[in-house]
Design a protein with these regions (language model features):
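Alpha-helix N-cap/loop-to-helix initiation residues
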Residues: 32, 60, 126-130, 230
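Cysteine/selenocysteine-centered motifs that mediate thiol-based redox chemistry or coordinate metal-sulfur cofactors
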Residues: 232-250
Length: 250
């Protein structure tokens, strides 16, 4: 199904003469998918830009080197350097193992060496307000840094423990100012209202869905219906999207 989804995206790009279209592979954790490298090769053969969002735990220097010339950007999600904060947020495995900063620093160096752009995503919540993330960003040297206000999708993750993690707008702004990193780096701030209706996702089974007014809603399946027809039904806010990505080069 994944290749059929890619074919549908490729058709949409060609029909609409989109020359710099990009497929962003996210999850879950995409590096757990055993056929990921086959999928990357398949997308690359179609000359579509590729980006990957990962927690970085399964990255290796060898894999990064093999992606050189195929993957344009690797995004690493890192919300905290304190193990307790990571566990509170949920960034740990079943044995409560959390990410290793030294490993991420090595991977960041490998990404830069491979000529791949590095992006860092941090979700800002009550659990990491006191974290010194600036030192992490200085060590990783990202080309792009996105600070994301924790987002609640009411029919997906509206649990008491999630609601308890929501910071005030003032707390979010304080986190941004304390951890602002802009050394040869594009800083992007993403707040809840800026995310709603401004991006869509396609799962491996072809289902197209969007975050609409705080709810995750499905609008069709790209394997069985042209994306152009599905997009015509989406409550997609292109102005919001353009504002988020007008200066994006990676």
């Amino acid at each position: 199904d994944a290749k059929k989804v890619i074919d549908s995206i490729d058709t949409y790009f060609r029909e609409n003469e989109i020359e710099n279209g990009r497929i962003n592979i996210a999850g879950g954790e995409p590096l757990m998918y055993r056929r990921l490298d086959d999928i990357i090769d398949y997308i690359a053969e179609k000359n579509i830009n590729i980006s990957i969002i990962t927690n970085g735990a399964l990255l290796t220097e060898e894999r990064i080197a093999a992606w050189s010339g195929k993957v344009a950007m690797i995004g690493i999600s890192i919300d905290a350097i304190n193990a307790d904060a990571d566990i509170h947020i949920g960034r740990c495995d079943a044995l409560k193992n959390t990410n290793d900063l030294e490993h991420l620093i090595r991977m960041a160096k490998a990404i830069h060496k491979a000529g791949i752009k590095l992006k860092i995503n941090t979700v800002v919540s009550k659990a990491n307000l006191d974290e010194d993330m600036l030192s992490v960003y200085e060590a990783l040297k990202p080309d792009r840094l996105k600070l994301i206000y924790i987002h609640v999708v009411h029919n997906v993750n509206e649990w008491p423990e999630t609601m308890d993690l929501i910071p005030t707008v003032g707390e979010y702004n304080q986190f941004v100012e304390k951890n602002r990193y802009e050394e040869n780096c594009e800083l992007v701030l993403e707040r809840p209202m800026e995310m709603e209706n401004s991006y869509f996702m396609i799962n491996p089974h072809g289902e197209v869905y969007i975050n609409c007014f705080g709810l995750e809603k499905k609008y069709g399946n790209s394997i069985y219906e042209p994306l152009s027809e599905i997009f015509s039904r989406l409550p997609f806010d292109k102005k919001k999207f353009d504002l988020r990505y007008e200066d994006e080069t990676i």
